[in-house]
Amino acid sequence: MESVVLNQLFRSMNSYRHLQGHAFATPFTAHSRMSDVILSSSAALLIISRCGIPLGFGDKSIGQICQEHHVDTKTLLLLLNSSIIENYDPTPEQIASVHLDSLLKYLTNSHSYFLDFRLPAIRQRLLSAMSNCPQDLTYVIRRFFDEYAEEVRKHMSYEDRVVFPYARKL
């Protein structure tokens, strides 16, 4: 069951591809230089920061940086490759090698980023874009967005409070 869920998760991780100008074909490895990964895709910055890896790694490899920051290398590689490389299809062995705590840390930090930064920024841009709209229309759109944001908060809170602790117990 766990591998089925992880398999689906990694197959659906295409959310960062819009941040890059082109698709990449060669998967990154533990020996790839982190600076090369960042230069090839700005989306990698979001991923590594959510794994707790700060900037300032010079010419170090992904493996070296993961070791220094206590991040599972195989999990980070799967996150990077699944998010950045077009049509990346991880093997069952790669999916089975995921370190659950590293993945859950990434997901928890992703929730925090989205709830604390992205949703408020989207709301602010939406309000700014509606500055010249009729007040009744602005009210309806703002209310719709706020209700949507609340549903997202509830969903992510449920995952943080219920799903992730349950997954840790498996």
Question: Where on the chain are the PLM-derived regions?
Answer:
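Small-residue-biased structural context
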Residues: E2-L170
